[in-house]
């Protein structure tokens, strides 16, 4: 036995991975298992070219010594030797060598070898789809170590993902990380052969110089590694990481002249790891091995860095900005809305800048002044000179001391106006004085419309031809960009400012490089997206708080620094919380130290240690203000931790721990953050005596004492009123303030305040139970505070004190101080004299509780007792008060917007409280409404007051009341429900004044009228009113008499609004209305009747479309009246009709429905529907109709809403087919854009929902001449109802199966059918709402949603609906069916074609087969699905006459049935499963017909579901025994065994007949016994049964 055979016996080959044969060698790679069971990889190689190699050596070498040297070199260069040598190094990441065996030929060359390596079970890099960036960086570092070891030895030549193997492991946090190992050294070569030009490697990873045969150096491995890393970066799972490394990977793929070597790459990675102190915390080096790799590389590089004679040329990724060149240390991108660059100033370029400043101070001063004016518009002319001088000094100082200057550039890009304004608000907050001393404040903000730069625009330092080519490309791009016309003024201004700066630099230096730099700089400003560019200069030696800073510090130093850091965070967080800007807090109080920076002290304030270094305790702290992209800007703070320290820094100080724990406990109660911070400050001051010894904390204690003094005064005044237990004791449920109900879109409970007198003041406490959105609690408090800051009027508005959550229950208390006049009214009487009237929400009149009903009754009685004049006077008084209050409210908003520039301006959203004093004088007060009311309810507030005064008579007494209500709907639908629409609504207080004044010209008082200055002659104005201010999308313009609406770019006066149909049961809790608008065009004065229809609820701007088109009429009669034109988008449709006086009495289908909108079967509705169907069918497109409407993808031009002019001239109905379908069947087809597809099943399908409606009302239709006239049209013939006359019921299942006569030709020619009910669509209303549109043109599709049963697979409604259950005597286990229905949702994912009604599917598939019932058609009536089957004139075997049956006929019956069942099984793959005498029909000529396929199944369906296979369907006494006993089942797999249950059922039928008719045939008895063996394996199959019958 040879050595190789002995060696191979040690391993058992499991799998051959690869086999390679060529002229040079034969390779066999396999997975094997050693004797211990451990997997490994065997690689066996046979070298076939040794003789040729030896000949080459002899030609190239002159002596034997040289030949032997070449032989040794060739043997040493073999793969297993490289692997053996490098894998023994612990620091390398190379596949691990285990052992090998080799043999040599007679020349001394290795001719065969087998070597063994470790097996890596997780595959290679090519197999992973996602990878974290920290794993990519760790891979990079490990490959750099490998390449450093290879540097003077070998070139790998085939680095690629397929040759880097993986091993996954879990770190301490339980997260999966990757270890990588480089393998496959078969292509490796020693540097001895570097001048060779062998083309070896994988195409996409081969360096260009190899392909061009320019020789091999170790730079080709750098290229391959760069390509590998770039391919992996595309699979990165994160979106926040330092993208500067991506640029480095690109540089690694440069041409070899500019490609960095391994030493340069190592130096770059070590340097950039050190520079992390200037960046936000990223996870690039968080892999457990990354720091180890960096430390090793630093040690390897020491000698190279100290080499002064041949210094290492460093890699710099440079960026030019505003005339300076910077080293870019980091690029972080958060999605596409935010880029962040960490820049370090070039020292060489700084000297140039110093010269520029010294020689050209005037130019620089002007430029600096311009920049300051851009960033601060509040500078006045008197201060400009001083500012210029200061700027000069500052700039000169900075330029003299800016070596190593670090600049953080934050680019916030947004394409959305709202997002952009929020970002500007964020900038304004960070510029505010409250954060001046706490954050890096001396930043610059550039506002423009062009992203300043992108990662792909970073210019890397290059040399030679590449640099010249890059300059040419930049100049070319600049020339192209100059030709682009820039429309945006902000962008023009930005470009002019930058050009001025660049031109000055060009004039001073006269340097071509500077010209090119300016061109590059300008080329970055050519985009239409808005952006904010924030430049944050950080002082020299500023650094982030992290572990290494404190590793050598003593305990006292660590304690002082941690206290200063958390005090700094607490002070900043408290100041930010006062502004109500919650989104900033979560980045201040919990950022793992990413935003907290040490700042070096001023030279005069420094204290040095013994070694001359500045003491850490003298460093201050500054926040890098947390600019985040807009997805986080809007969100409130949701952090429950005060954790500003990185996890690597342990917290030991007890005060810091107490602060963190207290914040965690209190923040979970969702009380306002300002309150939490105030209490934390009190905790800090409690320990002040202990920490006074640290002078470094004096500043913070001074600030905290100032804050706490105000807070303690507030606590003394309120005596802890907001504590939940104290509130509970004070509340008296009998003492309440009722709040006037408001116009809102959803039913809510009545609002009220508990009145609490306390400490010489009176408070109102608002209580909320079961807060639905607990995270909104703290955010809501800030909204209230901002609202009250805008109002600033405690005489009319409740003053918010504080809020509290009871930890032990879901109760929230909001405490307000009552206005003084309201409080004095309470204190002056022994009982509450705030006699508010309270009316129920008018949406919910039928669902009120008893208290609400009593309030309504009292209110209505009081109103009836008063005269109309008294009510009128009271209404006038309150409306005047409210108008003046609203004017003041709007003025306050204008003032606040100008002075404060808040992030969000709150709209009107107030509780209305009406009081009456002892002098019978009513007054209005207001409290901010937290829930239940949309912000646009200023219109509805006037309606509320009228509703309070007049009660339910309001809309009858005041004709403008309905208009007010509907105007509020119109505004609300524009604003709250769908913000993305093409139309706009305009109104003003003067408009509301005019509306109410139509009822009474003396309604308003003079001072109000004079203050409004209404323009009565503005009806013909040509332009929109000048905007005074804007709240979201509602425009409050100049005073005008009429409200206005802008539709499709045309402005109309709103003369009147009527309410149309309402989708009351909308699944989102909303009511999608049709509003009837009477409009007057401003320019032409034409009047229109416009139907505004809300269709969808899409808020995505991309789905918004505008389409204004004139309808092409296909029928031109006077029945269906189409609009003149339609303006529509994806959400709203406007149908415009030329206004006529006859339109005053337009009605909807609701006017003709019976029993309070529950019956839509009236003859007028039936006629309208038939007219519409005729109209719909006549409006299909024709290919030759000349239409070029590319926007209309439907095949039908008909509209969903039309006017129907009834022939009797008694009514004009607007018919919305979607609304009618919704009312009839609960299917909201407006939720889908597939209008034609839906209508094909609703209308054009036969049968369909419409045919169901027609068939249900057939008696009314057949007795109405107008309906018959409509149905006589050739398009409508198929909709004519079927005339059915029931002859008799099949007794065993009452009302389910009947014999009927059907008029099939329409001429009273009747044909007999068997009609069977197989399901129902009663549940369609619920199903349609929950699951969307349903195709009803195919009955099989109904089964997925509606038709589930167990015994006969009937509809759910058979078991859930009592009436239907009583109607059909199903003889099934009711409880069992209910349990079956509970699993209803499981069926939604099943294949529709194989589901119920299965009987219909089966009968359709066997149509034409002899011996089975034949289906004719199906139809819908009264929501029941019926099938019609050909009538079989015979008897069933249960009722068959005794004269017909004998032994001969029994053999005939058995023979026919066995063949029918065999054909069903073999040809159609169907099993009947319910064989019994009732289901077998026979004629006098002994012809057999098999019926009732209600529980039949397709074979595939049965054999894929064992539970279904052995289900207990069918009839007891005829079921196979293996259904009930598993012991009797066959031993084989049900998928492969024949189905024998029908054989057993047939045996039971024959047994019944043989017993009933006294059969004496022994052969028949013997055969039937074989059919009836209880054990499945013993029973004969259908095939065997037929063979036995053929032998008889």
From Swiss-Prot:
What are the positions of the active site?
158 (proton acceptor), 1474 (proton acceptor)
Q: Which organism is it from?
A: Dictyostelium discoideum
Listed binding positions for ATP are 2-10, 43, 1348-1356, 1376
Q: Where is the composition biased (Basic and acidic residues)?
A: 486-496
Chain segments annotated as transmembrane = none
Give positions of region: Disordered: 348-402, 455-526, 837-867
Gene Ontology MF annotations: ATP binding; protein serine kinase activity; protein serine/threonine kinase activity
Q: For bias kind Low complexity, which ranges apply? A: 349-402, 499-526, 837-864
Catalytic reaction list: L-seryl-[protein] + ATP = O-phospho-L-seryl-[protein] + ADP + H(+); L-threonyl-[protein] + ATP = O-phospho-L-threonyl-[protein] + ADP + H(+)
Q: What protein am I looking at?
A: Probable serine/threonine-protein kinase DDB_G0293958
Family listed: Belongs to the protein kinase superfamily. Ser/Thr protein kinase family.
Q: Which UniProt keywords apply?
A: ATP-binding, Coiled coil, Kinase, Nucleotide-binding, Repeat, Serine/threonine-protein kinase, Transferase
Q: What is its EC number?
A: 2.7.11.1
Ranges for the Protein kinase domain?
Answer: 1-302, 1342-1592
Which Pfam families does UniProt cross-reference here?
Answer: Pkinase
- Mind telling me which InterPro entries this protein's record contains? Kinase-like_dom_sf (IPR011009), Prot_kinase_dom (IPR000719), Ser/Thr_kinase_AS (IPR008271)
Give start-end ranges for the coiled-coil region(s).
461-518
Gene3D superfamilies linked to this entry = Transferase(Phosphotransferase) domain 1
């Amino acid at each position: 036995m040879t050595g190789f055979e002995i060696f191979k016996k040690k391993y058992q080959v499991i799998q051959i991975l690869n086999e390679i044969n060529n002229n040079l060698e034969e390779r066999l790679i396999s997975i094997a298992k050693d004797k211990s069971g451990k997997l490994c990889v065997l690689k066996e190689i046979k070298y076939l070219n040794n003789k040729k190699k030896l000949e080459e050596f002899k030609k190239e070498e002159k002596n034997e010594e040289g030949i032997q040297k070449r032989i040794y070199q060739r043997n040493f260069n073999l793969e297993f030797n490289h692997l053996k040598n490098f894998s023994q190094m612990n620091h390398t990441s190379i596949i691990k060598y285990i052992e090998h065996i080799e043999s040599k030929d007679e020349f001394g060359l290795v001719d065969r070898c087998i070597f063994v390596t470790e097996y890596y079970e997780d595959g290679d890099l090519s197999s992973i789809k996602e990878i974290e960036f920290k794993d990519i960086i760790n891979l990079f570092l490990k490959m750099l170590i490998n390449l450093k070891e290879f540097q003077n030895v070998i070139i790998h030549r085939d680095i690629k993902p397929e040759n880097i193997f993986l091993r996954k492991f879990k770190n301490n946090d339980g997260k999966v990380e990757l270890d990588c190992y480089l393998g496959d050294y078969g292509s490796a070569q020693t540097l001895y052969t570097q001048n060779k030009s062998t083309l070896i490697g994988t195409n996409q990873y081969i360096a260009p110089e190899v392909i061009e045969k320019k020789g091999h150096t170790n730079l080709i491995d750098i290229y391959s590694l760069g390509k590998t890393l770039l391919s992996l970066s595309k699979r990165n799972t994160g979106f926040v990481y330092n993208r500067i490394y991506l640029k480095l990977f690109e540089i690694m793929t440069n041409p070899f002249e500019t490609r960095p070597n391994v030493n340069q790459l190592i130096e770059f990675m070590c340097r950039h790891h050190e520079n992390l102190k200037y960046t936000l915390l990223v996870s690039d080096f968080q892999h457990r091995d990354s720091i180890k790799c960096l430390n090793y590389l630093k040690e390897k590089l020491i000698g190279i860095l100290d080499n002064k004679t041949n210094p290492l040329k460093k890699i710099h990724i440079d960026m030019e900005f505003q005339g300076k060149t910077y080293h870019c240390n980091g690029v972080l991108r958060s999605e596409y809305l935010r880029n962040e660059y960490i820049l370090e100033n070039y020292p060489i370029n700084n000297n140039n800048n110093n010269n520029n400043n010294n020689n050209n101070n005037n130019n620089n001063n002007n430029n600096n002044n311009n920049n300051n004016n851009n960033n601060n518009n509040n500078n006045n002319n008197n201060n400009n000179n001083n500012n210029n001088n200061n700027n000069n000094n500052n700039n000169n100082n900075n330029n003299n001391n800016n070596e190593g200057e670090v600049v953080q550039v934050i680019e916030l890009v947004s394409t959305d106006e709202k997002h952009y304004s929020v970002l500007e608000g964020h900038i304004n907050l960070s510029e505010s004085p409250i954060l001046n001393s706490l954050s890096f404040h001396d930043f610059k903000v550039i506002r423009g419309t062009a992203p300043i730069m992108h990662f792909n625009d970073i210019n890397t330092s290059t040399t030679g031809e590449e640099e010249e080519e890059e300059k040419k490309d930049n100049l070319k791009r600049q020339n192209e960009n100059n030709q682009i016309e820039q429309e945006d003024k902000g962008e023009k201004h930005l470009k002019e400012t930058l050009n001025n700066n660049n031109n000055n630099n060009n004039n001073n230096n006269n340097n071509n490089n500077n010209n090119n730099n300016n061109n590059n700089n300008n080329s970055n400003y050519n985009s239409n997206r808005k952006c904010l560019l924030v430049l944050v200069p950080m002082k020299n030696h500023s650094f982030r708080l992290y572990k290494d800073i404190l590793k050598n510090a003593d305990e006292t130093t660590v304690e002082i620094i941690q206290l200063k850091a958390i005090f700094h965070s607490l002070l900043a967080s408290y100041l930010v919380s006062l502004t109500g800007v919650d989104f900033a807090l979560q980045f201040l109080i919990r950022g793992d130290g990413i935003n907290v920076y040490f700042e070096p002290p001023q030279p005069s304030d420094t204290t040095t240690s013994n070694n001359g270094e500045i003491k850490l305790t003298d460093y201050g702290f500054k926040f890098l203000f947390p600019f985040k992209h807009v997805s986080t800007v809007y969100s409130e703070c949701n952090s429950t931790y005060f954790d500003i320290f990185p996890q690597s820094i342990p917290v030991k100080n007890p005060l810091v721990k107490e602060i963190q724990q207290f914040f965690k406990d209190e923040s979970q109660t969702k009380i306002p953050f300002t309150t939490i911070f105030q209490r934390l400050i009190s905790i800090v001051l409690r320990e002040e005596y202990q920490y006074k010894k640290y002078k470094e904390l004096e500043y913070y204690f001074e600030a905290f004492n100032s804050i706490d003094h105000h807070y303690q005064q507030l606590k003394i005044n309120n005596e802890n009123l907001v504590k939940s237990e104290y509130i509970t004791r004070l509340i008296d449920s009998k003492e309440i303030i009722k709040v006037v109900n408001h116009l809102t879109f959803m039913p809510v409970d009545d609002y009220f305040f508990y009145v609490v007198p306390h400490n010489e003041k009176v408070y109102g406490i608002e209580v909320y139970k079961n807060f639905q959105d607990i995270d909104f609690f703290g955010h809501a408090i800030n909204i209230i505070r901002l609202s009250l800051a805008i109002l600033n009027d405690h005489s009319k508005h409740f003053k918010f004190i504080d809020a509290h959550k009871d930890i032990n229950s879901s109760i929230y208390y909001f405490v307000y101080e009552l206005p003084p006049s309201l409080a004095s009214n309470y204190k002056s009487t022994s009982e509450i004299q705030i006699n508010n009237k309270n009316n129920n929400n008018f949406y919910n009149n039928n669902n009120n509780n008893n208290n609400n009903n009593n309030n309504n009754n009292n209110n209505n009685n009081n109103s009836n007792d008063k005269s109309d004049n008294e009510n009128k006077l009271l209404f006038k008084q309150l409306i005047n008060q409210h108008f003046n209050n609203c004017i003041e409210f709007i003025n306050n908003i204008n003032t606040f917007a100008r002075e404060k520039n808040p992030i969000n301006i709150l709209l009107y959203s107030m509780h209305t409280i009406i009081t009456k004093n002892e002098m019978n004088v009513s007054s209005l007060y207001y409290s901010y409404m937290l829930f239940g009311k949309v912000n646009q309810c200023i219109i509805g507030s006037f309606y509320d007051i009228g509703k309070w005064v007049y009660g339910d008579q309001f809309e009858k007494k005041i004709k403008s009341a309905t208009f007010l209500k509907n105007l509020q709907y119109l505004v609300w639908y524009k604003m709250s429900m769908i913000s993305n629409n093409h139309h706009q609504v305009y109104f003003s207080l003067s408009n509301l004044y005019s509306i109410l004044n139509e009822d009474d010209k003396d309604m308003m008082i003079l001072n109000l009228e004079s203050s409004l200055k209404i323009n009565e002659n503005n009806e013909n104005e040509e332009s929109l009113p000048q905007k005074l201010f804007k709240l979201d999308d509602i425009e409050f313009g100049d005073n005008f008499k009429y409200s206005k609406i802008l539709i499709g770019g045309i402005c109309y006066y709103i003369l009147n609004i009527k309410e149309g149909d309402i989708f009351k049961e909308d699944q989102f809790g909303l009511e999608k209305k049709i509003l009837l608008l009477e409009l007057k065009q401003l320019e032409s004065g034409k009047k229109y009747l416009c139907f505004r229809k809300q269709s969808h609820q899409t808020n995505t701007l991309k789905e918004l479309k505008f389409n204004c088109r004139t309808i092409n009429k296909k029928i031109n009669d006077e029945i269906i009246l189409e609009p003149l034109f339609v303006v529509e988008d994806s959400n709203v449709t406007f149908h415009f009709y030329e206004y006529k006086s006859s339109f005053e009495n337009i009605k909807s289908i609701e006017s003709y429905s019976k029993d309070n909108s529950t019956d839509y079967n009236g003859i007028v509705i039936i006629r309208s529907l038939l007219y519409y169907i005729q109209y719909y069918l006549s409006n299909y497109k024709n290919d030759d109709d000349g239409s070029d409407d590319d926007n209309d993808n439907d095949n039908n031009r008909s509209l969903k809403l039309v006017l129907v002019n009834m022939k009797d001239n008694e009514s004009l109905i607007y018919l919305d087919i979607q609304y009618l379908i919704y009312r009839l069947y609960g299917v909201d087809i407006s939720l889908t854009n597939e209008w034609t597809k839906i209508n094909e099943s609703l209308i054009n399908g036969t049968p369909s929902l419409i045919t169901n409606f027609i068939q249900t009302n057939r008696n009314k239709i057949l007795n109405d001449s107008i309906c018959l006239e409509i149905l006589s049209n050739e398009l409508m013939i198929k909709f004519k109802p079927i005339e059915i006359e029931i002859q008799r019921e099949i007794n065993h299942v009452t009302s389910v199966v009947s014999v009927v006569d059907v008029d099939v030709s329409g001429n009273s020619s009747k044909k007999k059918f068997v009609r069977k009910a197989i399901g129902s669509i009663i549940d369609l209303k619920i199903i349609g709402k929950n699951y969307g549109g349903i195709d009803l043109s195919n009955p099989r599709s109904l089964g997925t949603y509606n038709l589930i049963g167990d015994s006969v697979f009937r509809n759910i409604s058979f078991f859930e609906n009592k009436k239907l259950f009583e109607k059909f005597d199903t003889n099934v286990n009711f409880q069992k069916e209910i349990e079956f229905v509970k699993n209803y949702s499981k069926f939604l994912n099943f294949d529709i074609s194989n589901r119920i009604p299965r009987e219909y599917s089966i009968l359709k598939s066997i149509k034409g087969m002899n011996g089975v019932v034949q289906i004719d058609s199906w139809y819908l009536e009264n929501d029941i699905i019926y099938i019609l089957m050909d009538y079989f004139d015979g008897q069933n075997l249960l009722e068959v006459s005794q004269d017909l049956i004998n032994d001969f006929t029994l053999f005939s019956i058995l023979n026919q049935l066995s063949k029918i069942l065999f054909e069903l099984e073999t040809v159609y793959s169907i099993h009947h499963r319910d064989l019994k005498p009732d289901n077998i029909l026979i004629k006098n000529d002994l012809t057999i017909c098999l019926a009732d396929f209600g529980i039949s199944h397709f074979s595939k369906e049965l054999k894929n579901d064992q539970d279904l296979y052995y289900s207990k369907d069918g009839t007891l006494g005829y079921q196979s025994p293996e259904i009930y006993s598993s012991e009797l089942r066959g031993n084989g797999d049900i998928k492969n065994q024949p189905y024998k249950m029908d054989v057993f059922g047939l045996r039971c039928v024959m047994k019944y007949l043989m017993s009933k008719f006294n059969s004496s045939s022994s052969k028949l008895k013997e055969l039937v016994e074989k059919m009836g063996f209880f054990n499945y394996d013993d029973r004969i199959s259908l095939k065997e049964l037929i063979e036995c019958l053929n032998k008889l």
